[in-house]
């Protein structure tokens, strides 16, 4: 049985490939665009059966000439995740139409289809639950994900021939994101800032939040991969699911976890947030005028639906997850 992973050389895709490998699954077709060649490193430690360029893959899908038999599932992680990319033509072709064509093919072939949606569909909302009236995307990236989610909702009413699951990823961090540049996680940037300068910068107070007190639902990519495989194990489950921890944590906590993990590797003791600030290992910079009124101070996934689907595992909190991530970066990137 063959499994197809799109975006396989990317951040979440390569972690799904790795998680499949840990189960002994290696009959994997890795689909990606390696124009950004350094992404190959994410696949180098994985076992796959074949690599296929994204453009050739979608051509074969559209012409119904893929040569693989007995495809067990498609994990579709290939998309443009740059929220600052405002090229609507590219975004809708790459994120919406590509995904729609894959859905149609998987439904024709009765193949389970697990795809990446995004918490960006909620825009600046304060309630993050999988309900249409709460979804107000603010950019074309969020809209491309939102629009496809609406397709799934309609298809579910009409009846599906095979499982389809969309995961609304919140703030994912972890290994194999180094190619993402400015779109890499805050944990990634904090690590490199601390290693280069010896301190981490955070935004100061704004819009009722104190210094560094803005919060996000930070979720480890290890948990993201586990949940993808949980639904792979349960083909009777379809729908759209938030994929966060259900816990909102401050940027202060993330910065402290990163700095303390680096200090631990240097043989130094853990410091409290107060001590880190007093020693100027965490510094606060004025909140940028350009972001005032546009910056989201809080996100937190409502994971009620995920729990109702039977997923019982606990998530890494920021301290534990970032500690594991920093150890990986020190071993692989430093």
From Swiss-Prot:
Any one GO molecular function term: ADP-glyceromanno-heptose 6-epimerase activity
UniProt keyword list: Carbohydrate metabolism, Isomerase, NADP
Pathway(s) it belongs to: Nucleotide-sugar biosynthesis; ADP-L-glycero-beta-D-manno-heptose biosynthesis; ADP-L-glycero-beta-D-manno-heptose from D-glycero-beta-D-manno-heptose 7-phosphate: step 4/4; Bacterial outer membrane biogenesis; LOS core biosynthesis
Annotated transmembrane regions: none
An annotated GO BP: carbohydrate metabolic process
Active site: 141, 180
Enzyme Commission number(s) from the entry: 5.1.3.20
InterPro entries, A to Z: Epimerase_deHydtase (IPR001509), Heptose_epim (IPR011912), NAD(P)-bd_dom_sf (IPR036291)
Residues that, per the record, bind NADP(+): 11-12, 32-33, 39, 54, 77-81, 94, 145, 172, 180
Keyword hit for NADP: yes
Needed cofactors: NADP(+)
Reaction catalysed by this enzyme: ADP-D-glycero-beta-D-manno-heptose = ADP-L-glycero-beta-D-manno-heptose
Cofactor remark from the record: Binds 1 NADP(+) per subunit.
Coiled coil (UniProt feature): none
One protein family per Pfam: Epimerase
Binding positions (substrate): 171, 182, 189, 203-206, 216, 295
Comment block on domains: Contains a large N-terminal NADP-binding domain, and a smaller C-terminal substrate-binding domain.
Assembly mode: Homopentamer.
General function of this protein: Catalyzes the interconversion between ADP-D-glycero-beta-D-manno-heptose and ADP-L-glycero-beta-D-manno-heptose via an epimerization at carbon 6 of the heptose.
Family per record: Belongs to the NAD(P)-dependent epimerase/dehydratase family. HldD subfamily.
Name this protein carries in UniProt: ADP-L-glycero-D-manno-heptose-6-epimerase
Organism: Neisseria gonorrhoeae
Gene that this sequence comes from: hldD
């Amino acid at each position: 049985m063959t499994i197809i992973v799109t975006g396989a050389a990317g951040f979440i895709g390569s972690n799904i490939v790795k998680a499949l490998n840990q189960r002994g699954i290696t009959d994997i077709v890795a689909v990606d665009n390696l124009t950004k060649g350094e992404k190959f490193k994410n696949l180098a430690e994985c076992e796959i059966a074949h690599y296929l360029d994204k453009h050739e893959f979608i051509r074969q899908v559209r012409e119904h000439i893929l040569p693989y038999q007995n495809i067990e599932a498609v994990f579709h992680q290939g998309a443009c995740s740059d929220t600052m990319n405002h090229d609507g033509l590219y975004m809708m072709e790459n994120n919406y139409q590509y995904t729609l064509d894959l859905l149609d093919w998987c439904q024709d072939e009765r193949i389970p289809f697990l795809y990446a949606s995004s918490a960006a569909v909620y825009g600046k909302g304060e309630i993050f639950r999988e309900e249409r009236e709460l979804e107000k995307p603010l950019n074309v990236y969020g809209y491309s994900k939102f629009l496809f989610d609406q397709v799934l909702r309609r298809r579910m009413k009409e009846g599906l021939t095979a499982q389809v699951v969309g995961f609304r990823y919140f703030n994912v961090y972890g290994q194999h994101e180094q190619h993402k540049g400015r779109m890499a996680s805050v944990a990634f940037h904090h690590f490199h800032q601390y290693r280069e300068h010896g301190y981490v910068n955070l935004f100061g107070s704004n819009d009722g939040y104190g210094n560094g007190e803005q919060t996000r639902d930070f979720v480890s990519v290890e948990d993201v991969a586990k949940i993808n495989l949980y639904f792979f194990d349960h083909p009777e489950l379809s729908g759209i699911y938030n994929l966060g921890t259900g816990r909102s944590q401050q940027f202060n906590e993330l910065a402290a976890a990163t700095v303390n993990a680096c200090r631990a590797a240097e043989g130094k003791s853990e410091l409290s947030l107060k001590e880190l600030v007093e020693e100027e290992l965490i510094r606060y910079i004025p909140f940028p005028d350009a972001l005032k009124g546009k910056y989201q101070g809080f996100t937190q996934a409502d994971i009620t639906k995920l729990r109702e689907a039977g997923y019982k595992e606990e998530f890494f909190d920021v301290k534990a997850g970032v500690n594991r991530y920093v150890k990986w970066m020190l071993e692989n990137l430093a």
